[in-house]
From Swiss-Prot:
Entry GO MF terms: 4 iron, 4 sulfur cluster binding; carbon-carbon lyase activity; zinc ion binding
Protein name: Phosphomethylpyrimidine synthase
Cofactor list: [4Fe-4S] cluster
Binding positions for Zn(2+) per the UniProt entry: 437, 501
Keywords: 4Fe-4S, Iron, Iron-sulfur, Lyase, Metal-binding, S-adenosyl-L-methionine, Thiamine biosynthesis, Zinc
Pfam families: ThiC-associated, ThiC_Rad_SAM
HAMAP family cross-referenced by the UniProt entry: ThiC (MF_00089)
Listed pathway(s): Cofactor biosynthesis; thiamine diphosphate biosynthesis
Family under the similarity heading: Belongs to the ThiC family.
Function statement: Catalyzes the synthesis of the hydroxymethylpyrimidine phosphate (HMP-P) moiety of thiamine from aminoimidazole ribotide (AIR) in a radical S-adenosyl-L-methionine (SAM)-dependent reaction.
Length: 631
């Protein structure tokens, strides 16, 4: 943690400098590779970690080495991870999916924006300095057409997005030849079906069944296709966004790029402060990952923060505004029903979801049913026209472990299952949001309830936090629950940062939250038995046993921290080749001793073998050649 706290002016200047000097860059000793597909224009980016060779013998003067294979890994950084690509935040990213969208012939450009709010913002000359200069002309489905990946999947169509995902999910493991690296323990998948090889047809089938979603708004062509579903790699979401008291457009774009660098599969923009519309445009035009929002936050800003003044018309206009900007998924709190609100009265911590509390207050003040529930079919019609996925929000999630798994939480979950089937009628993709604060012994029930009542739609949870006693360390308390529920079948984990319950996260907090959750997601993939998940672990263990320090750093989720911790006590270059670390020193290193034991055992085997051969030679009378019948 920095000893000197930066002023707001300094924070903005630092963020601006980051944006102005941004270049594509790879992690240490890594390079960007692309795997091509059968469909034209499908090139899937991955990061390949280059490893040093293993010393296997020879002399000091003429050592003998054995090459180690490069390790391919999933890469969320988009163009920011490719040193060959010129980055210009002012222009935004290349529109990767635009040719695929255009080739389908089922969309049309809008001559005028559908949202009154968007029209007003575009007409305001005072916003010119804040506005992203290359605003896209939005597209919408042609009349009578649906443009969702779910619709295509149900029609039996394998889209370029699906083929891209199939290659990406396999993580290039077909390139690995070493049996040591390919070894993997059997997993326990709790009913998930994990194929040995993920094909584009498998992706299509999972999407068609509603078990997976591909968040890919037709107005966000910059995004690289990814999938959320329990039969795929567990994904991680990072939250960013300004508030009424802090953060700027520059800082939010910086956090976006930073998030994708550290492994965010999706990013949610939860801005609640000024210039929400403009901030979101900058984020979308520069995001290689899907972007989600909670539209009720901006709708509330439009009525000056007074929940009672919210209307369906204001909310509908907000949906159109965001859909035409390119938001890939909406969190909609349509399951907070009027009759469920009294169920929270005896809770220790009441309703802790911002969206849930807004809708609960509206329901009570008007004594009417939630207008999101009442107008849900109209919401689905909007989503179907742009391919916006729905993330059905858990507005009644528990905010403390005392309130976990209560009547209100599961009543809402069952309603979300009802809404899922309605959304599917419109070919709208759906995932379900989950808690929250849940002690370990109560976590699995959340997964089984969701699978049963929400028809196996992907589950997306915030943690859950497994204890409430650790403010400042809630990335740990929730990472434990995240690993567990990911193992049980949760498809995406929403990260928690060290600032949870305390304040708005900065760059370092974002990184800490993401690393914690990438660990949780990877641990879940290992436990489920996702094919190829153990390759990187095996490569790390091999490098560790062989004292290949540089490879250990480079294989780490965070190479920079691994190197820094090592160099705190052994900063010299000789420390990078030493057969010990500062924990045990040269005399007590268990791995060094293990190597010596292995070498000794091998030598003993040779010596015993030679003795046996000598005895056998003497027993045959010392003859060099044997007759054929004796051989």
């Amino acid at each position: 943690m920095s000893a000197t706290k930066l002023t707001r002016r300094e924070q903005r200047a630092q963020a601006q400098h980051f944006i102005d000097t941004l270049e594509g860059s790879a992690f240490p000793n890594s390079k960007r590779i692309y795997i091509t597909a059968t469909q034209p224009g499908v090139r899937v980016p991955m990061r390949e970690i280059q490893l040093s060779p293993t010393l296997i013998g020879g002399s000091k003067e003429q050592p003998q080495y054995e090459e180690n294979e490069a390790i391919p890994v999933y890469d969320t950084s988009g163009p920011y991870g490719d040193p060959q690509i010129a980055i210009n935040v002012q222009q935004g990213l290349a529109k990767l999916r635009q040719p695929w969208i255009d080739a389908r012939g089922d969309t049309e450009e809008l001559t005028v924006r559908s949202s009154d709010y968007t029209k007003a913002r575009l007409a305001d000359d005072g916003l010119d300095e804040l506005r992203f200069s290359g605003v896209l002309t939005p597209k919408r489905a042609k009349a009578g057409r649906r443009v969702t990946q779910l619709h295509y999947a149900r029609q039996g169509i394998i889209t370029p997005e699906m083929e891209f995902i199939a290659i990406r999910e396999n993580m290039g493991r077909e390139r690995i030849r070493s049996e040591v690296l390919r070894h993997q323990h059997p997993g326990m998948s709790f009913g998930a079906r994990l194929p040995e090889n993920i094909t584009a047809e498998f992706v299509r089938d999972e999407v068609a069944a509603g078990r997976a979603i591909i968040p890919a708004n037709i107005n966000h062509p910059e995004s690289e296709p990814m999938i959320i579903g329990r039969n795929f790699l567990v994904k991680v979401n990072a939250n960013i966004g300004n508030s009424a008291v802090t953060s700027s457009i520059e800082e939010e774009v910086e956090k976006l790029v930073w998030s994708t660098r550290w492994g965010a599969d999706t990013v949610m923009d939860l801005s609640t402060g000024r210039y929400i519309h403009e901030t979101r445009e900058w984020i979308l035009r520069n995001s290689p990952v899907p972007i989600g929002t909670v539209p009720i936050y901006q709708a509330l800003e439009k009525v000056n923060g007074i929940a009672e003044d919210l209307t369906w018309e204001v909310f509908r206009d907000t949906l159109l505004e965001q859909a035409e900007q390119g938001v890939d998924y909406f969190t909609i709190h349509a399951g907070v029903l009027l009759r469920y609100v009294p169920m929270t009265a005896k809770r220790l911590t009441g309703i802790v979801s911002r969206g849930g509390s807004i809708m609960a207050k509206w329901c009570l003040s008007h004594h009417q049913e939630n207008f999101l529930y009442q107008h849900f079919r109209e919401i689905c019609e909007i989503c179907a026209a742009y391919d916006v996925s729905l993330s059905l929000g858990d507005g009644l999630r528990p905010g403390s472990i005392q309130d976990a798994n209560d009547e209100a939480q599961f009543a809402e979950l069952h309603t979300l299952g009802e809404l899922t089937k309605i959304a599917w009628e419109y070919d709208v993709q759906v995932m379900i949001e989950g808690p929250g604060h849940v002690p370990m012994q109560m976590i699995r029930r959340n997964m089984t309830e969701e699978l049963e009542h929400c028809h196996e739609a992907p589950f997306y949870t915030l943690g859950p936090l497994t204890t409430d006693i650790a403010p400042g360390y809630d990335h740990f308390t929730s990472g434990i629950g995240a690993a567990m529920i990911g193992w049980f079948g949760c498809a995406m984990l929403c990260y928690v940062t060290p600032k949870e319950h305390l304040g708005l996260p900065n760059k370092e907090d974002v990184k800490q939250g993401l690393i914690t959750y990438k660990i949780a997601a990877h641990a879940a993939d290992l436990a489920k038995g996702h094919p190829g998940a153990q390759i990187r672990d095996n490569a790390m263990s091999k490098a560790r046993f062989e004292f290949r320090w540089e490879d250990q750093f480079n294989l780490a989720l965070d190479p920079f921290t691994a190197r820094a911790y090592h160099d705190e006590t052994l900063p010299q270059e000789s420390g990078k080749v030493a057969h010990f670390c500062s924990m045990c020193g040269p005399k007590f290193c268990s791995m060094k001793i293990s190597q010596e034991v292995r070498d000794y055992a091998a030598a003993q085997t040779i010596e015993v073998g030679m003795a046996d051969m000598s005895e056998n030679f003497r027993a045959r009378g010392g003859e060099i050649y044997l007759r054929k019948e004796e051989a």
